[in-house]
Amino acid sequence: MVQTDISQLSGECTTWRTNLRNYREEFTQDKIKLQQAVGHTLPKDKFQDVEHLQNQFHIQLINIHDLKQAIKAHDRKVNLEMESNNGQLHDETLTEHENLFDQYQALESTLQELRSEFNGFLERTQ
């Protein structure tokens, strides 16, 4: 077991969840913008791009939800362990925290790529 600053771990979890919530709101709005773009006359070759973006928004919104829930459960686990183990965490819990951070960074990179791809699509269709 390792003595750890719970406020730092909880703070990181809160930050990750807040950022994921912001991405969720952004991509929900982007789905609406995409539907509005489809309402305009688009060349047939753009419909494949629309379908790709719709699929990506759907998949990434699911990924955001799943990771947010995993972080929330981890944060609860950290708090429970700290209370029941006199302020100490199991090594596995710290490893889980690091793994969640890696997952968060990977998802954030994917989300930024999707944001860039979508903005490029909007520029090409307007």
Positions of PLM-derived features:
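Charge-rich amphipathic alpha-helical interaction elements
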Residues: 1-126
